[in-house]
Structure formats: C-alpha cells, structure tokens
C-alpha cells in the first residue's frame, strides 16, 4: 500500500491475543480504551451500546463459569485476562449488533494502540428474552 499513516498501520498490525499477563491494567489504560469505545460510530448517533468493565477476579470467574455452562465447555473464554470489557447492545434496536460491533472494533484498536493485548470474544454473545 502506498499510503501510510498511524491509523492504517494500527489497523494492519492489530492481532488477537489469547495469553495475558496476570498484572491488572491501569485505570488510565482502561479509560483510554473505553473512551475510544464511546467514540465509535453508531446508527443515527444513538450511542446505545453500554460497556461494562470487569476487573474483579471472582466476577470474571463467575462470568467464565456461566459462559462455559451455556457453551458446554470448561474453557475460560477470557483466556485469563485480568480485565474484560463487555459490550451490551440493545435487544430491540435494529442496529444494536452493528453498533456494538463498531464499539468492539474501537476497543480492540485502542488496546493495540497502547500496547495491550485484546481479543473479540463472540462466544459470550447471549440473547435473552
């Protein structure tokens, strides 16, 4: 590609990570990543997705257990990451999945941009009535 810039390089170099250091990320790092999520494009500018950051080990373990029960597996969907950011889309919003997906994209790029590993965990997707 003949055009090079910081954004295109970040997009091209981002990779999924499935092995994490046990050290917790800093509040500043978490804020940087989630702020990028809030800047994601959304249909009609609704900004409807909600991000929930989970750093408590017991809560992460419970979320992992619940996911394993739904998926019929015992593996940790978060690969031992000390932080998980759940992105929730509105069930009745016809663009909810797309809006949440755009937020996820921003989260992944922001994490990569500041040197953090990240991975889209689609297995956590669960529709409830």
Listing of model-derived features with the role each one plays in the protein:
Residues 109-113:
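Short hydrophobic alpha-helices that are characteristic scaffold elements of the AMP-binding
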Residues 15, 89-91:
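Short, histidine-centered active-site or binding-site loop motifs used for metal coordination
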Residues 84-88:
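Active-site-flanking beta-strand signature of metal-NTP-handling nucleotidyl enzymes
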Residues 101-103:
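Charged helix-capping and loop-helix junction motifs
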Residues 92-98:
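Short pre-catalytic strand/loop immediately N-terminal to key active-site residues, enriched for Gly-Thr
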Residues 1-83:
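N-terminal amphipathic, basic helical "cap/leader" segment at the start of enzyme domains
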Residues 114-123:
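Glycine-rich phosphate/pyrophosphate-binding loops
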Residues 127-128:
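Conserved small/polar residues in nucleotide/adenosyl-binding loops
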């Amino acid at each position: 590609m003949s055009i090079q810039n910081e954004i295109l390089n970040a997009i091209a170099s981002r990779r999924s990570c499935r092995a994490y250091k046990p050290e917790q990320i800093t509040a500043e790092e978490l804020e940087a990543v989630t702020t990028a999520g809030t800047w994601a494009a959304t249909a009609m500018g609704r900004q409807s997705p909600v991000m929930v950051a989970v750093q408590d080990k017991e809560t992460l373990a419970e979320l992992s257990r619940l996911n394993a029960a739904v998926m019929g597996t015992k593996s940790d969907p978060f690969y031992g990451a000390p932080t998980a950011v759940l992105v929730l889309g509105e069930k009745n919003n016809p663009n909810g999945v797309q809006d949440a997906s755009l937020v996820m994209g921003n989260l992944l790029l922001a994490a990569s941009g500041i040197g953090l590993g990240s991975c889209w965990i689609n297995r956590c997707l669960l529709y409830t009535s």
